[in-house]
Each structure stands twice: as C-alpha cells, then as structure tokens.
Amino acid sequence: MADNLRKLVSTESLRSMQDKLENWLREYNNNSCDQNLNYCLELIEQVAKVQGQLFGILTTAAQEGGHYDGVETIKSRLLPWLEASFTAASLGKPVDSKIPSLQDTFDKERQKESVIRDRNIHQLDADLNTTRNQLNQVQDDLAETEKTLEETKNRSAISLLAAEEEINQLRKQLKCLQAQEESRHRPPEHRSSEKRGSERRRVEPRGADRCGAAQRKAEEICDYEKQLRTLKDEIAVLSAEKSVLQGRSTRSRSPSPASCSRSRSHSHSRSRSHSHSRSGSHSRSHSRNHSRSRSASPSTAVSGVRSPSPNRAKLSSVARKAALLSRFSDAYSQARLDAQCLLRRCIDKAETVQRIIYIATVEAFHVAKMAFRHFKIRVRKSLTPSYAGSNDFEDAVLDYIICHLDLYDSQSSVNDVIRAMNVNPKISFPPEVDFCLLSNFIQEICCIAFAMQTLDPPLDIAFGADGEIFNDCKYRRSYDSDFTAPLVFYHVWPALMENDCVIMKGEAVTRRGAFWNSVRSVTRCRSRSLSPICPRSRVGLSTISRSRSPSPIRCGLPRF
C-alpha cells in the first residue's frame, strides 16, 4: 500500500490538475465550446485515474485490516457518499451534504429496534411477574386448603375419640349399676330361721324402700341404655360414612372393584368391632384365622363364637345398611358406566348394552342369594354342636356370616352368572365377544347382594319384565324414553326393595308398543354361544334347560 501511495505522490497528478484548472479558468471565455469540453474531459480522465489509484489503495488498506477492521468506516463514509453521488448523478444535481446518509438511516432503524426490543422485554417481565404472583397465590391457597383439611380431620378424629370415651364411661357406669343391683338382690346364704322371724317386720319397710330404689335405678339404667344405643347408632353411621368415603377415594385411584368391595367389607367389620367390643375381639380372631385360607370351613372357628347381645344385630345393621346402599348407588353411577364403556367397544347398539348389564345385575342377585343360602346351611351344620338347645342360634349363625364375609367365593358366583347369561335368549350378542369383560362388575354386584342378605330384613331387587306397566314409584324414566308411554320397553337398572317398600328407584325405558316389540325380539333371538368357562362339548340340553329354585321375587322370570 505504501508503494502505491508513493507512486501517486511522485506523479504529481493533483498538482498538474490544479495548473490545468487555473489555465482553463483564464482561457475559458476565449476558448470555443469544443476546447472547453476537451479541457473538462481531460480533467475527468485525470480525476478518474487518480480515483482508480485511490480505490486501489483503499482496497489494499481494507485487506490489510482483515475481515472486521474498517467495516464501520466504509459504512459510515464510503456508502453514504456513493449513495449521495449516485442520487445526485441520476437527478442531475450537485452533491449536497445535507442529504441524510445511510449511516443515519441505519442508526435510526437501530434505535427503533432497540426501543421495540426494550418495550417487549418490559412487557415480558410484567407478564412473568404476574404469573409468579398468580403461582404464589395458588400455592398459598393450596397450603390453606391443606391446613383446613388437616384441621377437619383432627376435629373428626377428636370427636370420634370423645364419643368412644363417653361410650366407655357409660359402659363402666352400667356395669357398676348392674353389679350393685345384683349384689342387692342376691339372697343371703347363712341366715338362721330365728333372725328371719325376728327381722321380718324390719325387712318389710326396708324391702319397700329397696323396691323403690331398685325401680329408680332400673329407670336410670334404661336411660343409660337408651343413651348408649343412640351413641352406638351415631358411631355406626359415622363409621359407615367414613368407610364409604374411603372406598370412593380408593376407587378414584383406579383399583379393581373386587379390591374395593373387600376394603369396604373390612371397614364395615372394623366399624362394627368398635361399636361392639365383646364380639369384635372374636371377629378379629376369626378373620385372622381365616385370612390364610379363603376356602376354610366354618367349623374351624366354632369354639370362638359367642352369643351376641340383643341389640348387636340391630346396631350393626344400621351401619351396614347405609354402607350397602352407598355401594349399590356407586355401582349404578360408576361401575355400570364403566361396564357400558367396555361393551360399547364391541357393540354399537346402546339398547343391547343396557339389556346385558341389567340381566347381569339380576342374575348376580339371584346367584348371590343362592350362595348365601348354601353358606348359611353350612354354618348351621358347623355351629349346631356348640349351640344345642340355645335360643340365640340363628343370631349366632348370622353374626358368624357377617364377621366372615370374606369367605364368600365370589369368583364361583361370577362363573355361574356368566353361564346363565350365555343361555339367556334376550341377549343378541356377537359370538366373538365374551361376557368375561363384565367379570369385575358382576363380582361387585354379587358381593353387594350377598352382604344385603345379612340385613334384617334383607334387601333385594324388584322383579321386572318387559312390557309391564310402568310404575312411577319403582322406576324413573330414561332420558330417551317416551314419557307418555304406559309400558316398559326394557329395564336399565333394577329397583331396590325392603320387603314391599322401595328404597332406591331403578331406571327403565318406556316406549309405545313395548310389549309387542319385546315379544318379537324374544322370538327372533338366537341362542348364545357358551362362555369358555363352560365348554361346548360338556354342555348339553340338560344345562340349557336346567331348573333353579327361584326366589319369590324372581319366580315370574322365564328360565331357558
């Protein structure tokens, strides 16, 4: 670069150019137009040569600066000059220094971008702070909710403990009063006949006083017993509600219905053992003895069974009835819908799905009642030697069944229900799909029905037939029903009965002409292919036309 600059200085082109300009200025008026043009062109050529040399020096200097040096200088000096020169040349105007350069434009755009960027950053910071505040608020609300829940749990536990403590105190007072009453009414063992004769007159007024005191004490004892029964009923109901809530929370974590039913049965037995301390210890010992083997015989625990108190079955029946009603309601609202979802994967028709679930529920109740009868017969045979001539034999049998509900073989009942459904002519079902899909639902219904037979009086479902007159006291109409139709087209869910009283309404679909449609559907239906549980090769006509001993509620249902 230094050599090129030295050559440019040595040629003295700029000095000669200055001389030519001065000569041209002196002779401009005397020269012709051609001569002035020649002078101008010579100067332009000379300036172009000098510019070429200067651009060469500029290129060399820029190369010596590397990739990044000199970039800002070129942008700030060369590019604006070129822009102004080309603009002036295109417009035919001289170069004006007041025209904004590219550098100014770049600076303005850079400032605008920085302002926009700062504005966006501030907006993002504000949004981030708002989100953080909301998150902190949610965390505070969550902490407060947890504290409130913990306080509620503590209060409920304290109230339960206080109730149990009060019950224990009442029991102690009752025992003391009974002991005093027995000691007062106990006859003296060694009394001479002389003292009896001499003290008769003294004993008569004392006996009258004692009778009055005994009556007052008896009234107090009756009051204490009433209070005790009331507290036991309240504790039983609270324990049942607690077990129901625990069962719902465990089902929301998606366990199987079988495990839910077992957990509920254990929770009922625990609440029952709290309300009855004497028999509770025996029931826990029986459950520990039988937990090792589900198929153990009832005779293994005959020696541990004791006669229950008169109020025991009544008190426990209140809690168990509330829990079973809640389980039956949950089966309708949750387990039934889950079973419908499973069947709708294979069946498109909603009517067929609802018929299948209703028939499964009816068959499950029938099989569970039969299993309860057989189980009760076995318990009677096992307990007969130890309760010969006892008046509390039936209470002892029922108490043993209540304490050992886990001995019920629900899987065998599920297999029986599936066999009965396979030969039911009302179900038109694809042969490639099996009713084993409903095993969990059927098992839950069987466990509920079996436990309902231990109540006094037992609970059962109402008899329902297609084409019957719709009873508003037993059923509610489904959403897709014809609300003016008087006949039932088909049943969705059975009604729950206690003797002749309706406890829970069922659900039915009503349509006009339901009776004739149901008759046609029965005549057109083909027989079902049997479940893999019962192979075809072993099932003959005797299995299909088998007879059962129907319950009074199911005596009108046809059997095929």
UniProtKB/Swiss-Prot annotation:
* UniProt-annotated stretches for the region Interaction with YWHAG/14-3-3 protein gamma: 1-294
Task: Quote the biased-composition stretches of kind Basic and acidic residues, using this chain's numbering.
Answer: 181-209
**Positions of the region Disordered?**
178-217, 243-316
> What GO molecular functions are on record for this protein?
cardiolipin binding
Compartments it resides in: Cytoplasm, Cytosol; Mitochondrion outer membrane; Mitochondrion matrix
Q: Where is the composition biased (Polar residues)?
A: 300-310
Keywords from UniProt, A to Z, are: Coiled coil, Cytoplasm, Lipid-binding, Membrane, Mitochondrion, Mitochondrion outer membrane, Phosphoprotein
Which residues does UniProt call coiled coil? 118-186, 223-248
GO cellular component terms, semicolon-separated: cytoplasm; cytosol; intracellular membrane-bounded organelle; mitochondrial matrix; mitochondrial outer membrane; mitochondrion
The yes or no answer to whether the keyword Protein biosynthesis is present is no
Any Pfam family hit: MIEAP
Transferase: is it a keyword of this entry?
no
Spans traversing the lipid bilayer: none
Modified sites of kind Phosphoserine: 13, 85, 156, 159, 307, 309, 531
Where composition is biased (Basic residues), the residues are 263-293
Q: Which cysteines are joined by disulfide bonds?
A: none
Family indicated by similarity: Belongs to the MIEAP family.
Q: What does this protein do?
A: Key regulator of mitochondrial quality that mediates the repairing or degradation of unhealthy mitochondria in response to mitochondrial damage. Mediator of mitochondrial protein catabolic process (also named MALM) by mediating the degradation of damaged proteins inside mitochondria by promoting the accumulation in the mitochondrial matrix of hydrolases that are characteristic of the lysosomal lumen.
Entries under PANTHER family matching the protein: MITOCHONDRIA-EATING PROTEIN (PTHR21771:SF0), MITOCHONDRIA-EATING PROTEIN-RELATED (PTHR21771)
The name under which this protein is listed is Mitochondria-eating protein
Q: Which organism is it from?
A: Sus scrofa (Pig)
